[in-house]
Amino acid sequence: MEYPAPATVQAADGGAAGPYSSSELLEGQEPDGVRFDRERARRLWEAVSGAQPVGREEVEHMIQKNQCLFTNTQCKVCCALLISESQKLAHYQSKKHANKVKRYLAIHGMETLKGETKKLDSDQKSSRSKDKNQCCPICNMTFSSPVVAQSHYLGKTHAKNLKLKQQSTKVEALHQNREMIDPDKFCSLCHATFNDPVMAQQHYVGKKHRKQETKLKLMARYGRLADPAVTDFPAGKGYPCKTCKIVLNSIEQYQAHVSGFKHKNQSPKTVASSLGQIPMQRQPIQKDSTTLED
């Protein structure tokens, strides 16, 4: 006499999740393990399907969504430095990159893609040590034993990729510094950043920037440049006098202040005229006289 085989539930990754009683299936409830496999497989597929974007917009979207793995200057999955816009687009749209992303996801799962960071206690630290003997995230390699892992970490390939990763950090910092210098991306006077040249142009002809320019010229006229840079102060926050450690609310107040006796007393090294003449060195005071010697 033949008996029917126990029912099985197929997991989303194609493998059988194991036998379960027919009552569980009839109730329409999946065991927790199967639900987890289905959810994980769905999320994994969504990430993998977007591993090979097409066009600039999709590439930028992928970088923004997965900044822990991809940047404008480095692909951390492939350990590749991207020194130009064309190289960046070509790399992220390549089949080779997509295959490495799939392999990376198979090893590390979804946590790295989401940028999740976990606080490690002593147990987790020991787990990390075990993971190190199983795979190398820098070189995207897996090992069959701790001996093979140790051999890899002492080899030339790992040393080369590690050096490449360290250099990429410097390239990113240099890229950020260049953006700070580029007037189409950053206004050092107002501490404002821009996404495109059109936005930058609108800022430079705007009221806020012109006000800051007026402030800068005024302070230069009254000898303020002898103090630390005016740009140290937040944009639009009054008219600061670092010498006296006060902030004036208007141009008129600032003019009156720098022309006054109190401000000049606080500036023993220079005397600036209200007409904006070049600051002159004050001679030593003798017999309570404030007369300057020629």
Curated annotation (Swiss-Prot):
Sequence segments annotated as region (Disordered): 1-32, 262-294
GO molecular function per UniProt: double-stranded RNA binding; enzyme binding; miRNA binding; RNA binding; zinc ion binding
Spans through the membrane: none
Bias kind Polar residues: ranges: 267-276, 283-294
GO cellular component: cytoplasm; nucleolus; nucleoplasm; nucleus
Binding site for Zn(2+) 2: 136, 139, 152, 158
Keywords, in A-Z order: Acetylation, Cytoplasm, Isopeptide bond, Metal-binding, Nucleus, Repeat, RNA-binding, Ubl conjugation, Zinc, Zinc-finger
Sites where the protein binds Zn(2+) 1: 75, 78, 91, 97
Subcellular location: Nucleus, Nucleolus; Cytoplasm
UniProt keyword Signal, yes or no: no
Pfam families: zf-met (PF12874)
Domains as described in the record: The zinc-finger domains are required for binding to dsRNA, and also for nuclear localization.
UniProt function note: Binds with low affinity to dsDNA and ssRNA, and with high affinity to dsRNA, with no detectable sequence specificity. May bind to specific miRNA hairpins.
Protein name: Zinc finger protein 346
Organism expressing this protein natively: Homo sapiens (Human)
Organism lineage: Eukaryota, Metazoa, Chordata, Craniata, Vertebrata
Name of the encoding gene: ZNF346
